[in-house]
A protein has these predicted regions:
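Charged phosphate-binding loop/patch that engages nucleotide di/tri-phosphates or the phosphate backbone
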Residues: 153-169
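Polybasic low-complexity intrinsically disordered regions
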Residues: 1-84, 88-97, 107-108
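A structural signal for well-ordered alpha-helical scaffolds and beta->alpha junctions
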Residues: 58, 88, 127-130, 156, ...
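Structural motif
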Residues: 29-32, 147-158
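Short, solvent-exposed polar/charged micro-motifs at secondary-structure junctions
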Residues: 7-13, 113-115, 157
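Helix-centered, glycine/charged polyanion-binding patches within enzymatic domains
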Residues: 79, 84-150
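A general structural signal for well-ordered alpha-helical segments in protein cores
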Residues: 62-65, 134, 160
């Protein structure tokens, strides 16, 4: 599970951008600032999407995952593998209370206290598959396109890109 930014226009054109003004916003990630929305995605071990949602930039990844585990994946017994942004004892307990499990990497400040087992390290290496899924969506299936002239055009482009990924898998 992870999220990726979907810019709807370039940052310097964001003030005059009117098409997606209702659901777009400013945010920052490791690559810098952007104006757009976020795609939240949960995939299985093969990289096939199980759940996805387009959210505003203000929606936190942890909030979305908590909502998904309480509705879609309640009492399923899934093992979710996430990055270090999903760390936290209280958050792990919330996910465990929904009947699911959460495996995350260990932050640098906690590395001396909690060693991971070999199978956990191998599962964390599989997390790169969701990044590959995002790369395919953006590079091959043109998920990030700023050529649409209406909100429906953006949504149609996003749906076609995700459908192409699922069918092409």
């Amino acid at each position: 599970m992870d999220s990726t930014p979907l810019p709807v226009c370039r940052l310097h054109k964001s003030r005059s951008h009117k098409v997606c003004k209702e659901f777009s916003g400013y945010s920052k990630n490791s690559m810098g600032f952007y104006y757009g929305i976020k795609l939240q995605l949960i995939t299985d071990i093969d990289g096939i999407p199980l759940s996805l949602q387009f959210t505003t930039t203000k929606t936190g990844d942890r909030d979305w995952l908590e909502q998904e585990t309480q509705t879609t994946f309640k009492d399923c017994g899934y093992l979710f593998v996430g990055d270090k942004g999903y760390c936290g004892v209280e958050f792990h307990k919330k996910i465990l209370n929904t009947g699911n499990y959460l495996l995350t990497g260990i932050k640098r400040s906690k590395k001396a206290t909690l060693p991971l087992a070999l199978w956990q390290l191998q599962l964390l290496k599989l997390r790169a598959r969701i990044e590959t899924c995002f790369d395919k969506l953006k590079d091959y299936y043109n998920l990030v396109s700023t050529k649409a002239r209406s909100p429906l055009g953006y949504q149609l482009n996003w749906i076609i890109s995700i459908f192409s990924l699922v069918v092409g898998w």
